[in-house]
Design a protein with these regions (language model features):
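Structured alpha/beta reader/binder surfaces that contact nucleic acids or chromatin modification marks
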Residues: 1-127, 192
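Short, well-structured alpha-helical interface segments that form or flank functional binding sites
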Residues: 16-18, 57-62, 168, 172-179, ...
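Alpha-helix N-cap recognition
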Residues: 75-76, 161, 233
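Active-site donor-binding loop signature of nucleotide-sugar glycosyltransferases
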Residues: 104, 220-222, 264
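Secondary-structure boundary elements
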Residues: 127-168, 172, 258
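Charge-rich, solvent-exposed alpha-helical interaction surfaces
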Residues: 131, 237-244, 274-277
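Hydrophobic/aromatic-rich core segments of domains that either
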Residues: 175-250
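Alpha-helical and coiled-coil interaction segments, frequently adjacent to or embedded
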Residues: 246-281
Length: 281
């Protein structure tokens, strides 16, 4: 859903139905339902406005509303707004600026999220899984061609960016994690790498989402276990995945398995460079 980050106390003033216009220097053509996200920072406001909001939740989506209009301010409009002093004090009104009109405000269960500038997209995990539904398992080689045969994978694989993935609609787990990272960047996410270094080499990457003190294994690339799985602890999640990995590939020696988190790699690196990154970062 489209989301708007607003500093406190103004986000909570919308939630509490004191503020009905979000004032901006620019227009928007978007009309429809939006989330209101309380930014981490605070904005200067008079004591009376702070008293109207009570406890605030910076870093959380706190309500939703309908964005029904974007009004270019003129003197007549501003004079009308001034009839409601709290509305006027809750925004920056000047001819040529815009007032985004919000209606049907509804308080929701707070959702922890990282904010962004302008209108940005917040996706549920189910929505992201649906966005990935047309992604096929394959890879892009160093000539920019999409491949579904893995005969030369070790020699010509390159890691795609999320923009590449949106074009090719194809990727192995390494690539798919980067597309998932793009969609879920505003969540508490960690990417993980698991690899067996034995008589053969087998690896996998996946994403873990922390949400409401739960740990979620988000899996799309591994078709057999495609889905969203919730656990009470990170250890429980990682142990379950490790056991599934060992059973899937008939691995008996768990001491030859590396399971670790890794940070976002650069795109367009080859397989050797990718392994060096995930093994050491």
């Amino acid at each position: 859903m489209k989301t708007l980050s607003i500093k406190e106390p103004y986000a909570s003033l919308i939630k509490n139905k004191v503020k009905h216009y979000e004032t901006r220097s620019y227009d928007t053509k978007y009309r429809g339902e939006i989330f209101i996200h309380a930014s981490l920072g605070k904005k200067e406001a008079c004591d009376e406005l702070w008293k109207m909001v009570g406890k605030v939740l910076p870093g959380y989506i706190i309500c939703k509303a309908n964005l029904v209009d974007s009004i270019c301010m003129d003197d007549e409009f501003i004079n009308e707004v001034k009839k409601n002093p709290w509305e006027y004090k809750s925004g920056y009104y000047k001819p040529g600026r815009y007032a985004w009109k919000l209606e049907n405000v509804e308080v929701i269960k707070p959702i922890k999220a990282k904010g962004n500038l302008g209108l940005w997209n917040y996706y549920s995990l189910e929505e992201v899984m649906n966005l990935l539904s047309d992604i096929k398992y394959g890879y892009m080689n160093n000539a920019g061609n999409v491949c579904y045969s893995f005969d030369t994978f070790d020699d010509d694989y390159v890691l795609q960016s999320y923009k590449d993935m949106l074009k090719t609609k194809t990727g192995v787990c390494f690539d798919q994690v980067e597309l998932e990272r793009h969609y879920l960047y505003n969540r508490d996410i960690t990417s993980y790498f698991i690899c067996y270094y034995g008589e053969f080499l087998q690896s996998h990457t996946f994403l873990v989402v922390k949400e409401n003190n739960k740990y979620i294994w988000f899996e799309h690339a591994w078709e057999k276990f495609r889905g969203i799985y919730e656990y009470n602890s990170l250890d429980e999640l990682l142990n379950d995945l490790k056991n599934k990995f060992m059973n899937e590939y008939n691995i008996l020696d768990k001491d030859k398995i590396l399971l670790k988190s890794y940070s976002k790699p650069k795109s367009s690196i080859n397989l050797s460079e990718y392994f060096k990154w995930v093994e050491n970062k």
